[in-house]
A protein has these predicted regions:
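N-terminal cap/leader regions of alpha/beta-hydrolase-fold enzymes
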Residues: 1-233
């Protein structure tokens, strides 16, 4: 459970031991690799994974943003690019490979903007399974990525989506559009919807939107999904 830098100087938070059977990449929300994201990585480590959370805002000094400071979070998000994110994902998976974790051993999970990133990562062929918690960009692409509707047929690994019906930024209609488009993918896909879930329902630090029942179930669904889809050693 430490912060460190990869050989190329890229900062990450890591939890767990390198003799774990599998690794999980944890992709941050718009608020940085903060206490919540670190705690998520710790939970995966407690479940037996080597967890790593890359600092996607590292080009801006790896800031942590207050939950009530939306404008600042949006500013840092606006600085993200498809090229930069791809480089960061590749640096992370290449580091994991040096520890013995090949693509089939690696899961990726992302929250909010990180959910969009984890969906994109599932098209690269560098991870074995992916999960998205309320990731946007379904109809309109973000960070230079195509919309998720366009990326859906290109998925190269199993993907799990976890969405809340009360999410004001991601209407249920869009989620169901995505479900329909995912039928074109050549891999297993699954969407779980939570009737009482708002955007950010998994984050216990955001008390106004946190839903304990949905959060616990969604985390367990992710563990179960990775247990099935990642390579057996």
């Amino acid at each position: 459970m430490t912060e460190q830098k990869l050989p190329n100087g890229f900062p990450v938070y890591v939890a767990g031991t390198t003799d774990a059977h599998h690794a999980v990449i944890v992709i941050q929300e718009a608020f940085g690799v903060n206490a919540h994201i670190r705690s998520v990585a710790d939970r995966f480590a407690e479940a037996g994974y080597f967890a790593i959370a890359p600092e996607l805002f590292h080009r801006d000094g790896s800031p942590e943003v207050d939950y009530d400071d939306g404008p600042t979070a949006m500013k840092y998000m606006a600085n993200l690019t498809m090229e930069g994110i791809t480089n960061d994902l590749n640096a992370t998976t290449e580091f994991l490979a040096t520890l013995g974790f090949v693509a089939a051993d690696v899961g990726i999970v992302g929250y909010c903007m990180g959910g969009t990133v984890s969906f994109y990562a599932a098209t690269l062929g560098t991870v074995g399974a992916a999960a998205t918690f309320y990731g946007g960009g379904i109809e309109t692409g973000r960070f230079g990525f195509p919309p998720l509707l366009e990326l859906a047929p290109e998925l190269k690994c199993p993907w799990l989506g976890l969405y809340g019906d009360l999410d004001q930024g991601i209407p249920v209609e869009q989620v169901e559009q995505l479900r329909a488009e995912l039928a074109k993918a050549k891999v297993r896909t699954e969407i779980v919807r939570y009737a009482e879930g708002q955007h950010g329902f998994h984050c216990e630090a955001r008390r106004a939107v946190y839903n304990e029942a949905a959060a616990v179930d969604a985390h367990q669904c992710t563990l179960d999904f990775f247990d099935v889809e990642l390579s057996v050693k």
